[in-house]
Amino acid sequence: MNSIRKLYCRAFQLVFRIALPFLPYREPKLLEGVQGVAELLARKNVNQVLLVTDKGIRSHGLTRPLEDALAKAGIGVSIFDDTVANPTVANVEAARRLYLDAGCRAIIAFGGGSSMDCAKACGARIARPNKPLAKMEGLLHVMRPLPLLIAVPTTAGTGSETTLAAVITDGESHHKYPINDFALIPPYALLDPEVTVGLPPQLTATTGMDAMTHAVEAYIGGSTTRGTRQAAVEAVRLILESLPVAYASGGDRTARAHMLRAAYLAGTAFTKSYVGYVHAVAHSLGGQYGIAHGLANAVLLPEVLEAYGPAAHKRLGRLAVEVGVASVNDTPAQASAKFIAKLRKMNADMGIPRTLEGIREEDLPALARHADHEGNPLYPVPVLMDANELQALYRLVMPKTEENTNDAAADRTGGAKAETILLDRQNTAAGVSHQSA
């Protein structure tokens, strides 16, 4: 990235950090059980609600206790369960039509990050009927109150019940629209470990590492605060302790509750401190190939942290010490290496691969442009990279073939697109792009 653009990105991030205490962040009020949801809607005089979920969740009967509680309270439920793994513009528009046709007055997001994002975007389109989702991409392009929104997460990963973000995919172009607005933060949430008990081990693993990514990227970024650091540290501790248990023993209610708490805390951390290039790259992969977001984050996280090099060592090393992965006697570089090794071991123990299948070399320029557009200047990453440099991050998680091995060799002999960029930037990061704590 050229010097002028670097200066612009850092100036943008500095202004945002200064403004942070004055921005209208809020944390959702936590409800007690499905009866608490019904009581809240009754107090708000809501007699018809839109329930946004997916067919898998409904087929397992997870929504039934909530549906029964609402019916007992005399509240009608219109169910939209066509949400797909990477929710599309078409999903959002179909949910919006159902909301309007049924005369709904509130929305319940019941599911993982996909259902949450679909519900948030549906609310945004109801609040902004004349503004398409493409025009809401970026920061603060909704700016209108949404209908009453209640979030019920069934995975412990996205933390969407606490965040101002939603990501929607254009089904035709595969472009992902990250929408960030304070209006998208749900005012109420229900954290119920019972609805996560049946989560399959592999989904438990990848969604848990999604929460880990939120916490780590929030902690090492340039917009971190004391409060977000505390939330991130507690989230990482809980994940290190409870994710292996939840993966191995899905019925362990304590581990499930701790993971919901971790995802919630990580969500509060990155809502204020933002994420980094792990997310920017993962979003582009999800949009282009349908790669699950949690899986992409899990595979990318240790590779990107290592690629940041010395620029991330101070903060990442401090995090490693605070969560007990490293010793106070370790240097920042040693502590960082131990933390990255811990992530790789967790992934391996839970069957998460080191690479992602299906990424095509010819797609890298377009993928990297999407990541560049999403990440810069918004994400306060330790090392700034432009689209050309970001291509290296994709190659780190591509299965090794003769073709991309030759590409990497060419880069090492003078090219400017892959691993040598990372090595060069690691050598210069401390003097050029290091983010002081």
Task: List the model feature ranges, each with a label.
Residues 1-79, 437:
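An N-terminal, well-structured beta->alpha segment
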Residues 2-7, 316, 326-437:
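C-terminal charged capping/lid subdomain of soluble metabolic enzymes
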Residues 58-130, 245-256:
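N-terminal small/polar loop signature for handling phosphorylated ligands or for N-terminal nucleophile
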Residues 90-194:
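Glycine/threonine-rich beta-strand-loop-alpha-helix active-site module
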Residues 165-273:
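Carboxylate- and glycine-rich phosphate/diphosphate-binding segment that chelates Mg2+/Mn2+
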Residues 273-338, 344:
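C-terminal catalytic subdomain
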